[in-house]
Amino acid sequence: MEGSRPRAPSGHLAPSPPAFDGELDLQRYSNGPAVSAGSLGMGAVSWSESRAGERRFPCPVCGKRFRFNSILALHLRAHPGAQAFQCPHCGHRAAQRALLRSHLRTHQPERPRSPAARLLLELEERALLREARLGRARSSGGMQATPATEGLARPQAPSSSAFRCPYCKGKFRTSAERERHLHILHRPWKCGLCSFGSSQEEELLHHSLTAHGAPERPLAATSAAPPPQPQPQPPPQPEPRSVPQPEPEPEPEREATPTPAPAAPEEPPAPPEFRCQVCGQSFTQSWFLKGHMRKHKASFDHACPVCGRCFKEPWFLKNHMKVHASKLGPLRAPGPASGPARAPQPPDLGLLAYEPLGPALLLAPAPTPAERREPPSLLGYLSLRAGEGRPNGEGAEPGPGRSFGGFRPLSSALPARARRHRAEEPEEEEEVVEAEEETWARGRSLGSLASLHPRPGEGPGHSASAAGAQARSTATQEENGLLVGGTRPEGGRGATGKDCPFCGKSFRSAHHLKVHLRVHTGERPYKCPHCDYAGTQSGSLKYHLQRHHREQRSGAGPGPPPEPPPPSQRGSAPQSGAKPSPQPATWVEGASSPRPPSSGAGPGSRRKPASPGRTLRNGRGGEAEPLDLSLRAGPGGEAGPGGALHRCLFCPFATGAPELMALHLQVHHSRRARGRRPPQADASPPYARVPSGETPPSPSQEGEEGSGLSRPGEAGLGGQER
C-alpha cells in the first residue's frame, strides 16, 4: 500500500504522505517524468511552509524542529555534550533543570522561599529559556535562509505583534487583558504611587521605603491592596508603554524583581507584643491573644496572694497554697493588705494561714494584738472566724494551743460553757479555757468508757445511773456541737460535723470520725473475753480472736463468762423466773451446727435463736452495740474445761476443730456423697454431740436431746452455710 501511492497517476495522491521530509523528495524524483514537476514543486513548498509553521522549536545542535518545547527538552537529552539549561545572569549551563535551579539560588540568596515565590521563579526561568532558544533559532534561521525557508518568518510575524506575558509567555489579544493577567497572577502587589508591581508584599514594602521614603503610606497601600476595589485604576497607565515593544519588557522586570530580594532583613519592626493580663503570656498577633483568652472565659475569682495565679474553685487555691507552704516554710506570704514594714512578726503565721486544719494549727503561738487588728485576707476565705465576744478578736489572750491571730478554727469544738465564760471574764480566760478543755475531754472519754464497759459487781442501780450519765454526756455533746451525725450551729468547714476537734482532720462519714476519736480519748470498747486485749474496732478484736484464741472460740472459755450488760441497755427485759441470759454468742464461721436455743423456746421448736446483739441499743445516740464474739456455755453446761469436742451426727468421727468438721460433713455426708453410697449407710442412728471427755449418750438420751434440734442434715449443713 505504501509503495503503490506514489505511483498513482493522479496528482492529488502525491502530497498525501507528507509525514517523512527526507524520504518524500527521494520518492518524488524517482517517480519519473510522468508527474508534473511544477505542480509537485508548488505542493512541496506549500507543505514545507505549513510544516515549518507548525514546528516552531528547532534543536540548536542538530536543527530538528518540534511542536512543543517540552519535546525539544526531552530531545536535547539525547545529545551527550549539550547542556540546554543556561543561566540568564552569568551564562552558566546545566544539563538538568534542577541543577539550574540550585545555581539560580546563588544569585538570589535572600529571596523569600514561599510557594508563590518558587512558582514565579520557575516561570521566569522558563520564559528566559524560551527567549534564549528563540533567539538562537532566529540567528540560525537567518544565516541559513533559503528561498524555500524564507516563508518560515511569515507565521512567526503575528506572534511578535501579540501581547505576551513576560513570565509565562501567555498570549493576549489586548494590553488590558495582559495587565489584568499580570496583576492577578504575577504582580498582585502594586504600588499606589507608581507602576511598580511585585508578587511579594515584602518587595512592595522595600520599594516604598527606598523609592518614596514614606513608611506610613505604603502600609496603607498594602492593607488596601488585597481588596479588588482599588485595582482597576492602575491598569490603563502602562498601556501606551507596553504596546509598541512587548518583548524587551522582561528586561526591566528582571532588573526590578531581583533588586528587592535583599529587602527581607530590612522589614519594618514587628508590632508590640500582646500580653495576657491573666497569666502574663505574650503573643505577636492580636488574634492569637484573642484565641488564648478563651481559656480564661470562666471567672477566676480565687487568686493566690503569693504568685498571683487565679483559680476557678476554692479547693484549687487551697491545694496550690500547699506548694507555697512547702517552699516558703515559716515565711509569711505577702497578702493583698500588706503595707510598710512593721515590727517582726511570728514566722509561722503564713503556714497556719495555708493549713488552718492541720496539726500545726494547734501548736501556733498567739500573735500580738496589733496583728489581730489587721483585716483578714486569707483567713476569711478559709472559713476562719474571729474570736467571739470581741470584734476582730480583740479579747483577752487566748490559749496558746488553740488560736492564732485572733481567729479560732472550729470554734464550735470547744464547750459552750467555756465560750460563755471566756466572753464574761476575759481576764481569766486562759486558765478557764485550759481547765474546761481538759475536764471536758477527760469526762467525755471516761463517761463513754464507763457506759460501754461497766465494772463487774455493779448492780442495776449503778447501771441506771450510768445510763443517766450517758444521757447527760450526749446532751453535752449536742450542746458543744460534737454529736456524731448532727450539724453544728455555725457555718464553715466544720458545719458538716465530720471534723475532729482535737487534730482537725476531716472524715467522710460520722462512723469514721467516731472510730478516729477513740485514738484521742483512749476508748477501747472491744475487749477480748479470754485475755486483757482491748481494741478500738471490731475487726481488730476479730483478728485477735482468730490468731490467739482459735481453740477457745470452738467451746466455752476456761474462765467464768463475763457479766451481762445492764438491763437498761437491753431491747427487752428478761422473763420472770429465769436467770439473766448471757450476751448472745456469734457462731464461728464454718461451724457444723449452731448452739441449742435458749430455755425459753419449746423442746420441739425449730425456730432459729435470735441474735439480740444486732438489735440492742447501748443508749449512745441510737448506735448498735458491738458484737460479742466470745462463746458461752450452753444451758446444760456441757462444756468441759478443755473446750468442746465436735462429733459427727452421722458417724463416729470427732474433732476439736470446727473447720475439719465442716469439711468432713461436706465430703462424707452431703447429698452427692449419699448418692454414691448404698442406702443402708444412711440408716445408722445419728450420734449426738458430746463434749470432750464424756461418753456418747444412750439412744434414749439421744431422742430426748435431739427433740430440741432440727433435722440432722439441716443442723450440720446449716451451720456450714453460715
From Swiss-Prot:
Residues 425-438 have a biased composition (Acidic residues). Pfam families: zf-C2H2. A zinc finger (C2H2-type) spans 57-79, 85-107, 163-186, 189-212, 274-296, 302-324, 498-520, 526-548, 646-668. Residues 390-404, 634-643 have a biased composition (Gly residues). This is Zinc finger protein 219. InterPro entries: Histamine_H3_rcpt, Krueppel_C2H2-ZF, Znf_C2H2_sf, Znf_C2H2_type. The gene is ZNF219. Residues 668-677 have a biased composition (Basic residues).
